[in-house]
């Protein structure tokens, strides 16, 4: 698959294992709290502007992240362990297409079910929308940062990644709050990731 079938296999296996853990924990919580329900319904027409806006904000955030990365990375020294981690299991060629399909069918739906449908909605029952969205976004960032802090990266790199994932989590959280269904952020998350994965095929 692509130029490195091994990397693609590791990516697929790692993604499935990670998403399965999120799914099992989320289902376990919902099963334990019988009164807790995750809102699942197809977004209506009124949700389309929010979906488009959420995707737009996501791509804008990604663009600004890339621009700032080009400015930050040349000025810092990256450890060999961090460099090896960032290059680990990077899909190529057909692997990018597989990654895009996984994003739409698994990664987007499962992560939004867990981080927005379960975590954010549970927080929303006790706190304001801003607090719930922000806290769920931070938890989202924490899971995406692991195990980067243990690879001796510069503080600037950790801060940059934490800010990026927190903002993305906040965007998906806003979309969940705005539409009232985790299907909306799941769709936006999946489409966003899919576009990011297949974009290199056209460059």
Language-model segments: residues:
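Juxtamembrane/transmembrane-helix boundary motifs at the membrane-water interface
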Residues: 1-14, 74-77, 149-157, 200-203
């Amino acid at each position: 698959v692509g130029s490195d079938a091994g990397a693609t296999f590791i990516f697929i296996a790692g993604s499935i294992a990670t998403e399965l853990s999120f799914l099992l924990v989320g289902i376990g919580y919902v099963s334990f709290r019988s009164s807790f329900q995750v809102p699942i319904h197809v977004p209506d027409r009124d949700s389309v502007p929010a979906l488009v806006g959420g995707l737009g904000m996501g791509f804008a955030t990604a663009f600004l992240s890339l621009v700032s990365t080009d400015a930050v990375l040349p000025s810092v020294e990256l450890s060999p362990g961090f460099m090896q981690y960032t290059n680990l299991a990077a899909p190529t060629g057909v692997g990018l297409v597989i990654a895009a399909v996984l994003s739409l069918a698994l990664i987007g739906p499962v992560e939004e079910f867990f981080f927005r449908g379960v975590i954010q909605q549970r927080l929303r029952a006790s706190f304001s929308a801003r607090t719930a969205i922000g806290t769920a976004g931070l938890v989202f960032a924490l899971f995406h940062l692991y195990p980067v802090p243990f690879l001796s990266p510069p503080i600037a790199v950790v801060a940059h990644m934490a800010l990026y994932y927190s903002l993305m989590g906040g965007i998906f959280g806003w979309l969940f709050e705005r539409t009232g269904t985790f299907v909306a952020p799941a769709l936006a998350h999946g489409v966003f990731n899919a576009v990011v994965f297949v974009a290199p095929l056209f460059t």
